[in-house]
Design a protein with these regions (language model features):
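N-terminal Rossmann NAD(P)H-binding glycine-rich loop of SDR-like oxidoreductase domains
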Residues: 3-23
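NAD(P)H-binding glycine-rich loop region in Rossmannoid oxidoreductase-like domains
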Residues: 46-91, 95, 116, 120-121
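Conserved Rossmann-fold NAD(P)-dependent oxidoreductase catalytic core, especially the SDR/UDP-sugar
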Residues: 95-142, 164
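Active-site Tyr-X1-5-Lys
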Residues: 138-164
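Substrate-positioning beta->alpha
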Residues: 149, 176-181, 194-217, 223-224
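Conserved C-terminal active-site "lid" loop/helix of NAD(P)H-dependent oxidoreductases
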Residues: 206, 241, 265-274, 278-309
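Mid/C-terminal beta-alpha module of Rossmann-like enzyme folds, strongest
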Residues: 216-282, 315, 319-322, 332-338
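Amphipathic terminal alpha-helices
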Residues: 297-305, 309, 313-339
Length: 339
């Protein structure tokens, strides 16, 4: 069985490559010429360079290929200009799918990695309740909007295309760079949180996302959308306390900033990003993510239909993640990855 994994050099994609190889699949890793191959060293991997900005170019690059499965994990989570989200996440998906259709590739499954963020802050009334699949999405970030537009494009194709959409909450684990900023901050004695009111947060460990992808390949129903979390609901203090525990309980100053101050900081970050041409972690999208108070969602359909059972609760996942950061020297100032 052959599988094409886009975004193969990234956090999610590289873990998918690992699992596909372990399953004995013929693995094709879609990368850019500039992509790092740090986590793609296995000699069994076949590399293919794909240009998602051009449907015509994709047709040329994919001609003669015949994959059983495609997992589309390529995309961007932060950009200098909001329009770039649409160009990469929405149009890139459209171009890839249209190229596959033009080539009449006999796919068995196309798995699209979307996000819980397509729903935005739709259930902020207390007591908090779970977002469910019948709710109307109302994304409050440019990233979420671009992912929802890609979902709607897939829905518009109809039953002739065997697609399945996964909507993970915040993904963390080894090789991940965004949550790592929080780990690094706590290691340097500063724990930062946004807002004073209750915030219900959900997480999913990377290997549980990988599990869900291959369950969707094996058991998923075409056209379905599945939420992914570890099944728990947490507070921001819980996450930071677990990180501190795994770091050896360093002394730490815990700061809770009001949302108005966070708004100023992220607006400044947005301006700096546009001036330097480099995306900044604290940007307008990040403000809306941190402002949102309820990240609960219903994973029962995922469990019932796919047989998905998360193996990593937050405590174990944080333990494995911090251990990996230590072993790979990410907590060293000189060895920390660039974002």
């Amino acid at each position: 069985m052959s599988i094409l994994i886009t975004g193969a050099s990234g956090f999610v994609g590289s873990h998918l490559v690992d699992e596909a190889l372990q399953r004995g699949m013929e693995v094709w890793a879609a990368v850019r010429p500039s992509s790092s191959r740090r986590y793609l060293q296995d000699e069994r991997i076949h590399f293919i360079e794909l240009d998602f900005s051009s449907e015509e170019r994709l047709v040329q690059q994919l001609e003669g290929q015949a994959f059983d499965y495609v997992v589309h994990a390529a995309g961007v989570t932060k950009c200098v200009h909001p329009d770039d989200f649409h160009r990469v996440n929405t149009e890139g998906t459209q171009h890839l799918v249209n190229a596959i259709l033009k080539l009449k590739m006999p796919l068995k499954r196309f798995i699209y990695i979307s996000t819980l963020g397509v729903f935005g802050a739709i259930r902020e009334q207390k007591p908090f309740t779970e977002i469910n699949e019948h709710d109307t999405p109302l994304p409050n970030t440019a990233y979420g909007k671009s992912k929802l537009e890609a979902e709607r494009f897939l829905d518009s194709i109809g039953n002739d295309f065997p697609y399945i959409i996964l909507r993970p909450t915040g993904i963390y684990g080894p090789r991940e760079k965004d949550y790592f900023l929080m780990v690094k901050s706590i290691a340097r004695h500063l724990d930062f949180a946004a807002g004073y009111s209750r915030q219900d947060i959900t997480f999913v460990y990377i290997l549980d996302v990988v599990q869900a992808v291959f369950l969707a390949i094996d058991r998923g129903m075409s056209g379905r959308k599945y939420f992914l979390t570890d099944g728990g609901v947490y507070q921001s203090d819980t996450f930071s306390d677990l990180i501190r525990q795994e770091l050896g309980n360093p002394w730490c100053v815990r700061l809770k900033a009001p949302l108005w101050l966070l708004r100023i900081i992220t607006a400044c970050g947005e301006l700096v990003g546009r001036k330097t041409g480099k995306p900044i972690a604290l940007n307008n999208d990040k403000y809306n993510i941190l402002r949102q108070r309820n990240w609960r969602c219903n994973i029962e359909p995922t469990m019932d239909e796919l047989g998905y059972h998360p193996h990593y609760k937050l405590e174990q996942g944080v333990k494995e993640t911090v251990k990996w950061y230590r072993e790979n020297h990410w907590l060293s100032r000189k060895a920390a990855p660039k974002n």
